[in-house]
């Protein structure tokens, strides 16, 4: 399992699992998280052993949307770029592999973008969606 500051990446039984890993702030979309998510999506698409991609969240929420406390364009350690959120959505939409959003909790604002871009959405009955 590859672990970074804001995401987890693991391949299980032919599926690449990408977990948003900022439960302390409901997996809000910081520049670091967005860049790592993009990198994991690209890796999964390039890996012939991966047949599907699953995106989920760690903790009580799937994704709370934009991280309003994170400086725009903040880079992760060792990174020289920040990826625009729109590039993540385009990568999900254009993925040659099915992308499954496994919604474990509330999905708000930008988190709904991930839901809408995915091919399949699986959720619990008590999940909340909101703009």
Please place each PLM-identified region on the residue numbering.
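Hydrophobic/aromatic residues within transmembrane alpha-helices
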Residues: 18, 55, 67, 114-116
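Glycine- (often His-adjacent) and acidic-residue-rich active-site loop
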Residues: 35, 57-94, 107
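Conserved CoA-thioester-binding segment of acyl-CoA-metabolizing enzymes
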Residues: 1-58, 73, 90
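Conserved phosphate-binding and hydrolysis motifs of nucleotide-dependent enzymes
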Residues: 21, 27, 57-59, 65, ...
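Glycine-rich beta-to-alpha active-site loop
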Residues: 91-131
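Nucleotide phosphate-binding site architecture
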Residues: 26-27, 69, 109, 130
């Amino acid at each position: 399992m590859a672990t970074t500051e804001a995401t987890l990446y693991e391949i299980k039984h032919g599926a690449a699992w990408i977990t948003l890993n900022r439960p302390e702030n409901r997996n809000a979309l910081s520049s670091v998280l967005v860049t790592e998510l993009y990198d994991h999506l690209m890796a999964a698409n390039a890996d012939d052993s991966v047949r599907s991609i699953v995106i989920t969240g760690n903790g009580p929420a799937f994704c709370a949307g934009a991280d309003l406390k994170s400086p725009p364009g903040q880079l992760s350690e060792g990174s020289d770029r920040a990826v625009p959120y729109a590039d993540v959505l385009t990568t999900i939409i254009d993925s040659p592999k099915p992308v499954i959003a496994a919604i474990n909790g509330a999905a708000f604002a930008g988190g709904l973008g991930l839901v809408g871009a995915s091919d399949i959405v699986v959720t619990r009955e008590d999940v909340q969606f909101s703009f």
